[in-house]
From Swiss-Prot:
Localization: Cytoplasm, Cytoskeleton, Microtubule organizing center, Centrosome, Centriole; Cytoplasm, Cytoskeleton, Spindle pole; Cytoplasm, Cytoskeleton, Cilium basal body
GO cellular component entries: centriole; ciliary basal body; cytoplasm; spindle pole
Protein name: Centrosomal protein of 19 kDa
GO biological process, one term: cilium assembly
Gene giving rise to this polypeptide: cep19
Family: Belongs to the CEP19 family.
Job of this protein: Required for ciliation. Recruits the RABL2B GTPase to the ciliary base to initiate ciliation.
Length: 163
């Protein structure tokens, strides 16, 4: 059977992941409600998302839904279970997905560092120019002219006397 995922969302009460999909064989739009059991505010969102995606009962339906999107939905549910507002939870998710250029990555633990590297890799792949892109150029030549006078540094001037 082939299914085309259209929308994916979360229901807070009772907790469930809701998928709106199109059944390609029948040509009809349908809705699938996948209940979330044994999930608390202390649960690991990435692990729960993996378990749902690999569940044989839902696997065919969630094939086109990314694991990252399922993790976000679980984080929204986790924030709701903690008593946080939707706005606060969305801000936390956005903060996790953006890279602060001033942040010292040496101070992060291994798990957080792996998350940051994953976000950077995704951002790199998104912005990377591929051969098939219309504005792709194979060789870019840059001319560094020597018309401008090179600026000298203060420490260069002091060491010139010794030579």
């Amino acid at each position: 059977m082939s299914y085309m995922a259209k929308k994916c969302g979360v229901r807070f009460q009772p907790p469930a992941i809701i998928l709106v999909y199109e059944d390609k064989e029948a040509g009809k739009s349908r809705q699938r409600i996948m209940p979330i059991r044994n999930f608390s505010k202390y649960s690991d969102c990435s692990r729960a998302a993996e378990q749902l995606k690999n569940n044989p009962r839902h696997k065919d339906y969630l094939d086109l839904v990314s694991l990252r999107q399922l993790e976000k939905l679980y984080k929204l549910l986790k924030g709701h279970l903690k008593g946080e507002s939707l706005k606060v939870t969305l801000e936390e998710i956005k903060k996790e997905e953006t890279i602060d250029p001033e942040e010292d990555l040496n101070k992060l633990d291994d798990k957080e560092l792996a998350k940051r590297k994953h976000v950077m890799d995704e951002l790199f792949e998104k912005n990377r120019k591929k051969k098939d892109d219309p504005d792709f150029e194979y060789e870019i030549e840059v001319d560094f002219t020597k018309d401008e006078q090179a600026e000298s540094c203060g420490w260069d001037d002091a060491s010139d006397e010794g030579f």
